[in-house]
Design a protein with these regions (language model features):
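Conserved ABC ATPase "signature" region
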Residues: 1-9, 34
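Conserved ABC ATPase signature
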Residues: 13-17, 21
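Hydrophobic anchor residue at the start of the ABC signature
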Residues: 27-28
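Catalytic Walker B motif of ABC-type/P-loop ATPase nucleotide-binding domains
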Residues: 38-42
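H-loop/switch region of ABC-family ATPase nucleotide-binding domains
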Residues: 72-74
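H-loop (His-switch) and adjacent beta-strand-loop-beta switch element
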Residues: 85-99
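ABC ATPase nucleotide-binding domains
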Residues: 109-142
Length: 142
């Protein structure tokens, strides 16, 4: 609870917590089991940017300590902070590779059917959608 800054709510029922507070308690629960592998679906949902950053640092520390973190993230800028990315659509893997690889960025554009500008800024990868739609037709089979 201290790692996710949720200690002050330890006596409150989960139903009385906000979405972000509840998410931080659930993340603390995931850490408490001390598993070598964490599988998470949208762990950063409902968290404000400072707590998203804190959790990204926590996940990085787990990996550096020899653990494995697998996470589903739909926010591309957050997903780009990982070492590797698997881009999926319609239940199929379209691409797997390093987050900083141009072919990964191309796969993201394909799956979102939208031009995405990926830039490295202040030590982080950022993804910004273009205001113009991708000119190609979507090539993903349902």
């Amino acid at each position: 609870l201290r790692t996710t800054q949720a200690w002050d709510w330890r006596h409150r029922p989960l139903s009385q917590l906000s979405g972000g507070e509840r998410q931080r308690v659930l993340l603390a629960r995931a850490l408490a089991v001390q598993a070598q592998v964490l599988l998470m679906d949208e762990p950063l949902a409902n968290l404000d940017p400072p707590h998203q950053t804190d959790w990204l640092h926590t996940m990085r520390a787990l990996v550096e300590a020899g653990g494995t973190v697998v996470s589903v993230l739909h926010e591309v800028s957050l997903a780009l902070q990982a070492d590797d990315m698997v881009v999926m659509a319609a239940g199929r893997v379209l691409h797997q590779g390093a987050c900083d690889a141009p072919d990964t960025h191309a796969a993201l554009e394909q799956v979102f059917d939208h031009r995405i500008h990926v830039r490295h800024l202040d030590g982080m990868w950022m993804a910004l959608p273009s205001i113009h739609r991708h000119n190609k037709t979507r090539e993903i089979d349902a």
